[in-house]
């Protein structure tokens, strides 16, 4: 059985840890409000851009379609762009993203496809490297930036487009967390490159719209911007998901610390009471012996 001093020291240690987790919970809650607002504000822009893309793509024939829309003509080499966080202490967020990425990789490999990874964020590297060390093409470090934004999305998009133009992959899939709430962040996989062709969208109500200088020229400009917007949205969703998961994890840790403190306090009081009782018995026994 632990001594009273050991129990007292342990209670003090858990209380110190509880203060840290409580502080981290409050910081995450404050950051979450801003991150959630940024993620939600970016969604309408991405949706509207997708509508415009659908309208333009419906007016372009296959031969004149830009490469980013038409694709390479092959479907053999696939690249999984996996967006993880740079920091830990956010529950099972990163493990869920990695699990989704590995599931997509297994599905593609089972279909006879070649799979490579492009990793964004530090926390996904080690678990993916364990199973797919030779299939990691590149990684992009966002840990040096306090708040990754459009500049980072632009850099990632440019590198991916260059890789696509060089024939390093035929199809790129974006794997990232979608923020639902502080309790729910769903791993999502969307095709990024070539830009998915619309299915029955943008050809009806927009049929009378004429574009200048022309659909092909506008698409050449908008397609890279669409890729950058998708990556920017993924980074914003990642930030909101990270803060939500971190707030929830730290709240659980604070509650668990409180439960442990209560148990240790009861154990301490019982041990102290037993020690006092033992001392009293010894004193009484000594007095009777005299």
Curated annotation (Swiss-Prot):
It comes from the Bacteria. Keywords: ATP synthesis, Cell inner membrane, Cell membrane, CF(1), Hydrogen ion transport, Ion transport, Membrane, Transport. One of its GO terms (biological process) is proton motive force-driven plasma membrane ATP synthesis. Gene3D superfamilies: 3.40.1380.10, ATP synthase, gamma subunit, helix hairpin domain. GO terms for cellular component: plasma membrane; proton-transporting ATP synthase complex. It is a peripheral membrane protein. Transmembrane segments: none annotated. It is found in: Cell inner membrane. Pfam families: ATP-synt. GO terms for molecular function: ATP binding; proton-transporting ATP synthase activity, rotational mechanism. F-type ATPases have 2 components, CF(1) - the catalytic core - and CF(0) - the membrane proton channel. CF(1) has five subunits: alpha(3), beta(3), gamma(1), delta(1), epsilon(1). CF(0) has three main subunits: a, b and c. Produces ATP from ADP in the presence of a proton gradient across the membrane. The gamma chain is believed to be important in regulating ATPase activity and the flow of protons through the CF(0) complex. NCBIfam families: ATPsyn_F1gamma (TIGR01146), PRK05621.1-4 (NF004146). Belongs to the ATPase gamma chain family. This is ATP synthase gamma chain. It comes from Erythrobacter litoralis (strain HTCC2594).
């Amino acid at each position: 059985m632990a001594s009273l001093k050991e129990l007292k020291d342990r209670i003090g240690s858990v209380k110190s840890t509880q203060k840290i987790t409580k502080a981290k919970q409050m910081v995450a809650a404050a950051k979450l409000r801003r991150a959630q607002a940024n993620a939600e504000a970016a969604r309408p822009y991405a949706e509207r851009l997708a509508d415009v893309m659908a309208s333009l793509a419906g007016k372009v024939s296959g031969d004149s379609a830009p490469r980013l829309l038409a694709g390479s003509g092959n479907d053999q080499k696939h690249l999984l762009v996996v967006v993880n966080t740079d920091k830990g202490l956010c529950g099972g967020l990163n493990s869920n993203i990695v699990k989704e990425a590995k599931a997509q990789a297994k599905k593609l490999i089972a279909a006879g496809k070649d799979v490579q990874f492009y990793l964004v964020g530090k926390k996904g590297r080690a678990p993916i490297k364990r199973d797919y060390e030779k299939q990691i093409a590149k990684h992009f470090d966002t840990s040096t930036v306090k708040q990754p934004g459009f500049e980072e999305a632009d850099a990632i998009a440019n590198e991916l487009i260059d890789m696509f133009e060089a024939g390093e992959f035929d199809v790129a899939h974006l794997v990232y967390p979608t923020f639902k709430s502080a309790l729910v962040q769903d791993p999502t996989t969307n095709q990024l490159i070539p830009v998915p062709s619309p299915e029955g969208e943008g050809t009806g109500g927009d049929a009378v719209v004429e574009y200048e200088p022309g659909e092909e020229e506008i698409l050449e400009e908008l397609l890279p911007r669409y890729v950058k917007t998708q990556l920017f949205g993924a980074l914003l969703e990642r930030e909101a998901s990270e803060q939500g998961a971190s707030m929830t994890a730290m709240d659980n840790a604070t509650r668990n610390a409180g439960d442990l403190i209560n148990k240790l306090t009861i154990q301490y009081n019982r041990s102290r009471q037993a020690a006092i009782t033992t001392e009293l018995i010894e004193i009484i026994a000594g007095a009777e012996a005299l």
